[in-house]
Amino acid sequence: MKMQIQGETLQISEFAELGAANSNDFRDKARAALTAAQKNIEIDLSQTMFMDSCGLGTLISLHKTTCSRNGAVKLVNPTPNVRQVLDLTRMHRLFEIVNR
């Protein structure tokens, strides 16, 4: 998993799955990387082939964290499998999902 800071945004990329095996670690690392200056998180899902309910829970947890800072979580380039999970669970109503 790669993280970098761009202005008010923490950008996260390069991870193959977000599920029960790694979701707590993912959430903890993302929260630890946020400083007082970052209020947004942008998650690049272009290499993520698998996401389960634990992964969705992690995204919702990060959403709550950013909302408390008046920010948001943006999901970028989800793979077809991940996009299907997001659509079936109606997460597109909660998150901005962008294809670049």
Protein language model annotation of sequence segments:
Residues 10, 41, 71-73:
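Conserved beta-strand core positions
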Residues 31-52, 76:
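Short, glycine-/small-residue-enriched flexible loop/hinge segments at domain edges that mediate gating
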Residues 1-2, 100:
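Absolute protein N-terminus
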Residues 65-99:
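C-terminal structural segments of small proteins and small subunits
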Residues 2-28:
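STAS-typified acidic loop motif
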Residues 29, 59-62:
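Aromatic/hydrophobic pocket-lining residues that form π-stacking "cages" and hydrophobic walls in ligand
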